[in-house]
Regions:
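A structural signal for the main folded, soluble domain(s) of proteins
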Residues: 14-16, 20-21, 140, 144-177
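Short, polar loop/linker segments at the starts of domains and inter-domain junctions
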Residues: 16, 62-63
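C-terminal helix-rich "cap/oligomerization" subdomain common to oxidoreductases
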Residues: 1-2, 9-16, 105, 167-211
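Contiguous beta-strand/loop segments that form the cofactor/metal-binding neighborhood of enzyme cores
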Residues: 61, 67-149, 172-190, 209
Length: 211
C-alpha cells in the first residue's frame, strides 16, 4: 500500500515549496460547501478558522506560514468562491502564533487564528465556522473549548481524543490528523488535482502582507 504525507500528495518536490491544500478535505468544510450548494442557509457572510496545536508539533516558521497558514487561506477561498481582495496579518515575532483577516471580492470575510503554542497536555483544536444570513454551520462546541465530544482514550500518562473515520482508515488522534488522513487517502485514490494550484499566488500575498 502506497503511503504519502499530505505534502507529498500535493506534489511537493525537494527543490520547491508547494503548499499542501489539506483543508479541502476537512469534513466540516465539505459540509459547508454542501450547504452553500443547497442554498439552505442564505448568503455566506463570514468565516472563522481556528488551528491550535501543542508546542511539540510546532514547525519551522517557513512551513507555518507558507504551508499551514496558506492551506487555511486556500480553504477559506474554496468556501468564499471569489478572489482575494486583501489580507491583514498580525504575527507574534519568533513564535508560530498569528491572527489574520482575509477579505474577498464578494464581501465575504475570513478570520484565521493559528498557533502551535499550546501546553503539551492539550489536544489539537481545529474549528471551522461559517456564518450565513440565515444560520451557521460549525464544529465548534456551543459549550466548552475542546473538540466535539467523541471517543476518549486516557491513561495516567496520556489523554487522547480519537476521531472515528471511515472503516478503511484508522481512528485519527484529533481533527488535524483526521484531515490529513483524508487528504492522503484522496491522493491515493487519484482525487487530488495534480500540480501546485494557486500556491505561488497565496505565498506571494502572505509575503506582501507581512512586510
Amino acid at each position: 500500500m502506497l503511503t504519502l504525507s499530505s505534502s507529498e500528495a500535493a506534489g511537493r518536490t525537494g527543490d520547491g515549496f508547494v503548499t499542501a491544500f489539506f483543508w479541502r478535505k476537512n469534513p466540516v468544510l465539505e459540509r459547508i460547501q454542501q450547504v452553500i450548494a443547497e442554498n439552505c442557509c442564505g448568503k455566506l457572510c463570514s468565516l472563522r478558522f481556528t488551528w491550535s496545536r501543542p508546542k511539540r508539533f510546532a514547525t519551522g516558521e517557513r512551513e507555518f506560514l507558507y504551508d499551514t497558514f496558506a492551506a487555511m487561506l486556500d480553504g477559506a477561498q474554496q468556501l468564499a468562491g471569489a478572489e482575494f481582495r486583501s489580507l491583514y496579518v498580525e504575527k507574534v515575532p519568533g513564535m508560530n502564533n498569528l491572527f489574520a483577516l482575509a477579505r474577498f471580492t464578494n464581501e465575504v470575510a475570513a478570520e484565521c487564528e493559528l498557533n502551535e503554542c499550546l501546553p503539551e497536555t492539550m489536544p489539537d483544536i481545529c474549528f471551522v465556522k461559517a456564518n450565513f444570513s440565515n444560520g451557521h454551520v460549525t464544529n465548534q462546541p456551543l459549550v466548552g473549548y475542546f473538540n466535539e465530544e467523541g471517543m476518549v482514550f486516557a491513561t495516567d500518562e496520556i489523554l487522547e481524543f480519537p476521531v472515528a473515520e471511515l472503516a478503511s482508515l484508522p481512528p485519527a488522534n484529533g481533527p488535524v490528523e483526521q484531515m490529513k488522513q483524508r487528504f492522503t487517502e484522496a491522493a491515493r485514490l487519484g482525487l487530488v488535482p495534480p500540480g501546485p494550484g494557486n500556491a505561488a499566488a497565496i505565498q506571494t500575498m502572505i509575503r506582501e502582507a507581512l512586510r
